[in-house]
Amino acid sequence: VIEKFDYVFAENGTVQYKNGQLVSKQAIQDHLGEELLQDLINFCLNYMALLKLPKKRGTFIEFRNGMLNISPIGRSCTPEERIEFSELDKKERIREKFVAALQREFAGKGLRFSRGGMISFDVFPEGWDKRYCLDVLDDERFDTIHFFGNETTPGGNDYEIYDDPRTVGHSVQSPQDTVQRCREIFFPERANEC
């Protein structure tokens, strides 16, 4: 994939490729330090140990270069379990309460929290949201930068870049919706193709 595009920004833009070559890669552990990182991970593990959910699966904390992805049910849940947790989360606000507890515990530590998808949320250093890539793109002086995302409301992991004045934000619901919106915007003569 990275060879097909001029730029690829992974993990909130903290891993950057240009013309298929790795340009920059940030590491959350280098930025936060091991002590804060372990305090954060330990707090999350303790919090999740006390959660009573209909189901729990594996991979509750996924360590990535630019963030931690926290999933109370576990990332290895089945698609059906994902939907079940999402419905429960809408009613009981499990992730919202978890994030509120983290915000209290780690106030002033330079951390941000954002909802990601149906079963998880992301934890990353302030300034490491999806706008991170825009500074690189500013240097290229593009006329327009379009962003497509599904978590575009406040608290969602797409909100900041969706709302940034340097982008034209598009809220989408699925990969198919994204393809359709791209056709409408960039290839209007093909907008009605399947």
Which residues fall in each region the model found?
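Conserved acidic, metal-coordinating active-site core of Asp-based
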Residues: P54-H146
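A short acidic, often aromatic-flanked loop/helix-cap motif at beta-alpha or helix-coil junctions
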Residues: T14-K18, I119-D122, Q176-Q180
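Short connector loops/turns at beta-strand edges and beta->alpha or beta->beta junctions
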Residues: G13-T14, I73-C77, T153
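Active-site phosphate-binding/coordination module
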Residues: V1-T59
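Mg2+-dependent phosphoryl-transfer enzymes with acidic/Ser/Thr/Gly-rich catalytic loops
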Residues: F124-C194
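Structural signal for conserved beta-strand scaffold positions within catalytic alpha/beta enzyme cores
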Residues: F9-A10, R115, S171
